[in-house]
Amino acid sequence: GFNRIYKLFQSKSFFELEKRFSIMWMLDVSHCFDSIYTHSVSWALKNKAYIRKHVTNSNQFGQELDTLMQRSNNNETNGIPIGSEFSRIFAELIFQRIDNNIELDLMDEHGWKNKKDYVILRYVDDFIVFCNNESNAEIISKTINVKLNEFNLQLNKNKFKKYSRPFCTSKTGLIIKVNELIQNLESKLYEKHDGNIVLNKIRNKHDLKVYMINNIKSICLDSQASYSDVSSYLLSSLSKRL
């Protein structure tokens, strides 16, 4: 897997998927963490019928997680805290059940096999669908939404992003521009001679800082992006060069 979604778009596997499939849809779960119902972790680990049958048994793992999550969030059952590692693990338990349900439904209803007839990738609450025609993408997205609904979640249809080959997302374009800026910065900071790195003298550190900040602002403005869209890639790239 990838711990940052931008790493997917730079990976060998992404280009292999682009060779195999002509359609890519990006889908987003609406208000994901705010909408997660804490009891649904028990449904994910077992199923609703089992939980109802054993509702008085309070020492089940799912119920223990449910109770712990409620206590971390003022005893609320609707919504989980955003940002904590526990919340990410809690959500992942639910989403892995949803992933499995989607795959089973597409096989049972349409005879489609994952990684053969289509591929669904997921990064937290973002689904990326690869297939070979719009009608199949529509069926897959509807199936995803139905299976999300079973856990009181739903897709944000205002955030559907649809691409046909070649796949060039706004994120891809953003990363290309940031990478060019970093390479330009490198040329200002040092040069390579016979395999050795020679540091350049920075005559005005303030001017260099302003140059970087203004260029990042310009990239975000041109790409209609925010600092949060570029920060993780920028920090990762800079840390590798320090």
What spans do the regions from the language model cover?
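Helical (often loop-to-helix) elements that flank the catalytic cores of nucleotide-handling enzymes
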Residues: 131-155
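Right-hand nucleic-acid polymerase module
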Residues: 15, 23, 27, 61-63, ...
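Conserved two-metal-ion catalytic palm core of "right-hand" nucleic acid polymerases
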Residues: 1-82
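Active-site palm subdomain of RNA-directed nucleic acid polymerases
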Residues: 53, 89-124, 129-132, 136-139
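Amphipathic alpha-helical scaffolding segments
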Residues: 39-51, 96-97, 143-148, 163
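Glycine- and acidic
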Residues: 22, 75-86, 124-130, 215-219
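Conserved pre-motif C helix in the palm subdomain of viral-like polymerases
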Residues: 30-33, 75-105
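Conserved catalytic core of two-metal-ion nucleotidyltransferases
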Residues: 149-184
